[in-house]
Amino acid sequence: MPMTLGYWDIRGLAHAIRLLLEYTDSSYEEKRYTMGDAPDFDRSQWLNEKFKLGLDFPNLPYLIDGSHKITQSNAILRYLGRKHNLCGETEEERIRVDILENQLMDNRMVLARLCYNPDFEKLKPGYLEQLPGMMRLYSEFLGKRPWFAGDKITFVDFIAYDVLERNQVFEATCLDAFPNLKDFIARFEGLKKISDYMKSSRFLPRPLFTKMAIWGSK
């Protein structure tokens, strides 16, 4: 029986999950919910089902795999990572995965808060000012490794790809000074399963955010 991934019909927090499901050749189907237009941004498609799915903490995204019902995007990614041995093999690798997972989510939320803020245009220069320093830390952490934990890909590389590429969409030149990060993105997109997925009708790179966002809602 295929897994079910539920989320809005946007990229959002599901991008890394979709990529990981495709990479692991998982059998899954998507339940994509549509939000209404301004000014109401009607969410009834989701709210009508929210408390009927047996989720402990009802939210989007969710993954249902048989008796396992999981919310929180990183919990879903970790679950899939454990299923496919993509959580790091040594203690050092697992530490790197844990650190980066949380660091990436911090940075993801900073960008999301900016893009939903009514003062977006006023606050954008401040974000762009600190962006090179953020990218430099990722570049130094990756070093000469092919993947962020080491020689083998882990689930955190899927989050890293999403966050780095999302920032590249926001500011096209943000990785120009960091060739190892650009190489990482090319390496990730060059993976056969990922490349095939990106050419398919299932691939959903945009919109980045919901219709409520000031930037990234198209």
Curated annotation (Swiss-Prot):
The keyword Zinc does not apply. GO terms for cellular component: cytosol; sarcoplasmic reticulum. It is an enzyme of class 2 (transferase). SUPFAM superfamilies: GST C-terminal domain-like, Thioredoxin-like. Glutathione binds at Y7, W8, W46, L47, N48, E49, K50, N59, L60, Q72, S73. It is found in: Cytoplasm. Residues 90-208 form the GST C-terminal domain. GO terms for molecular function: enzyme binding; fatty acid binding; glutathione binding; glutathione peroxidase activity; glutathione transferase activity; protein homodimerization activity; signaling receptor binding. Keywords: Cytoplasm, Transferase. Its EC number is 2.5.1.18. InterPro entries: Glutathione-S-Trfase_C-like (IPR010987), Glutathione-S-Trfase_C_sf (IPR036282), Glutathione_S-Trfase_N (IPR004045), GST_C (IPR004046), GST_mu (IPR003081), GST_superfamily (IPR050213), Thioredoxin-like_sf (IPR036249). GO terms for biological process: cellular detoxification of nitrogen compound; cellular response to caffeine; glutathione metabolic process; hepoxilin biosynthetic process; linoleic acid metabolic process; nitrobenzene metabolic process; regulation of cardiac muscle contraction by regulation of the release of sequestered calcium ion; regulation of skeletal muscle contraction by regulation of release of sequestered calcium ion. It catalyses: RX + glutathione = an S-substituted glutathione + a halide anion + H(+). Substrate binds at Y116. Residues 2-88 form the GST N-terminal domain. Homodimer. Conjugation of reduced glutathione to a wide number of exogenous and endogenous hydrophobic electrophiles. Belongs to the GST superfamily. Mu family. Yb subclass selectively binds steroid hormones. This is Glutathione S-transferase Mu 7. It comes from Rattus norvegicus.
